[in-house]
């Protein structure tokens, strides 16, 4: 187990694969793709979905904590933070699964490989689009 390895036959360990953006473990994978790319549908889907989930939590956790802090003395307002936390998780789980699968399906149908940075951009882009639409909907009600 030198160098953070721990896999079979010199393969990197699970933690090292996740930290190096190789999100889906490749044990005994005999594909033609390069090691630095995501080439199968589950790898692409999982990569985009995880980045969408993490970036959503990155925005919703501070917003929920801010709501909890500012509305802590309000009778019903303090429960608003629970809704914010739930939307930070349920939004990517419900819609993020579908949109990430659609993105991965387009890449797979086109026969393209996805580099991990593309998964990051597409996942964070989904969250950014949701934030823009949410902000514009709230702004329209004022």
From Swiss-Prot:
Signal peptide segment? none
InterPro entries on file: Transmembrane_pr_170
Print the keywords alphabetically: Endoplasmic reticulum, Glycoprotein, Membrane, Nucleus, Transmembrane, Transmembrane helix
Residue ranges of the TM segments: 49-69, 79-99, 115-135
Primary location recorded for the protein, binned into one broad class: endoplasmic reticulum
On whether Cell inner membrane is a keyword of this UniProt record, the answer is no
Q: What is the membrane topology noted in the UniProt record heading this document? A: Multi-pass membrane protein
Per the record's keyword annotation, is Translocase included, yes or no? no
Q: Which residues lie on this side of the membrane: Cytoplasmic?
A: 70-78, 136-142
Query: Glycosylation: which residues?
Result: 29
An example GO biological process term is: endoplasmic reticulum tubular network organization
Q: Which family does it belong to?
A: Belongs to the TMEM170 family.
Q: What does this protein do?
A: May regulate membrane morphogenesis in the endoplasmic reticulum (ER) by promoting ER sheet formation at the expense of ER tubules.
* Protein name, per record: Transmembrane protein 170A
Q: What is the lineage of its organism?
A: Eukaryota, Metazoa, Chordata, Craniata, Vertebrata
Which gene is annotated as encoding this protein in its UniProt record?
tmem170a
């Amino acid at each position: 187990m030198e160098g953070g390895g721990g896999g079979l036959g010199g393969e990197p360990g699970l933690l090292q694969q996740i930290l190096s953006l190789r999100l889906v473990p490749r044990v005994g994978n005999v594909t033609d793709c390069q090691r630095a790319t995501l080439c199968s549908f589950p790898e692409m889907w999982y990569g985009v979905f995880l980045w969408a989930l993490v970036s959503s939590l990155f925005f919703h956790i501070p917003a929920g904590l801010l709501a909890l802090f500012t509305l802590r003395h309000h009778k019903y307002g303090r429960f608003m933070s629970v809704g914010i936390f739930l939307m930070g998780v349920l939004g990517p789980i419900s819609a993020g699964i579908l949109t990430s699968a659609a993105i991965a399906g387009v890449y797979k149908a086109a026969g393209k490989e996805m580099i991990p940075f593309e998964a990051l951009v597409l996942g964070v882009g989904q969250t950014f689009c949701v934030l823009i639409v949410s902000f514009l909907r709230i702004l329209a009600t004022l």
